[in-house]
Amino acid sequence: PAFQGVGQRLGTEIESSKDEAATAALKTVELDAVLGGRTPEEETFETRLYQFNGANSNLQERALEVLQYLKVMGDPTVTLETTPGKSAEEFLLDENRPKDVALLDDGRVVEEETMETRLYQFNGANSNLGAERSAEEMLLNENRPK
């Protein structure tokens, strides 16, 4: 089995209650059954996601990550800027970016063959209409940021 022993290791490697360790063991058995006993390496792919709430959290939530955002540099001029590793929360709370338009990736795989994920558009309070339209075109034409 691909995940044999993971549940037992979870109980000793991190601080967790007996209930959490038992739930982890049960879920790994279920995951192993879903994968048909194949090793997880066959199913892995590079991801840009990170998790928050700490290692001991029961609710390891996926956080949105800003892949790229369009920054207004003057009236109609728009430049593309990348921000690898910056969370959506950090981006959205930054008060210096009221004119920005962001494309956010939720990281959940929509189509397994292409490993495509869903993208969402965030428009700043004072964002330029041209930047908003450019981002909409990227989403509609599936010209996803790299």
From Swiss-Prot:
A GO BP annotation: actin filament polymerization
Expression tissues: Expressed in pollen (at protein level).
Coiled coil: none
Main location (coarse class): cytoplasm
UniProt keyword terms in alphabetical order: Actin capping, Actin-binding, Calcium, Cytoplasm, Cytoskeleton
Top-level division of the source organism's lineage: Eukaryota
GO cellular component terms, A-Z: cytoplasm; cytoskeleton
Gene Ontology molecular functions: actin binding
Localisation: Cytoplasm, Cytoskeleton
Subunit annotation: Binds to actin.
Family that this chain belongs to: Belongs to the villin/gelsolin family.
Function of the protein: Ca(2+)-dependent actin filament-severing protein that is required for pollen tube growth. Probably regulates the dynamics of the actin cytoskeleton. It can promote the assembly of monomers into filaments (nucleation) as well as sever filaments already formed.
Protein name: Villin-like protein ABP41
Lineage summary: Eukaryota, Viridiplantae, Streptophyta, Embryophyta, Tracheophyta
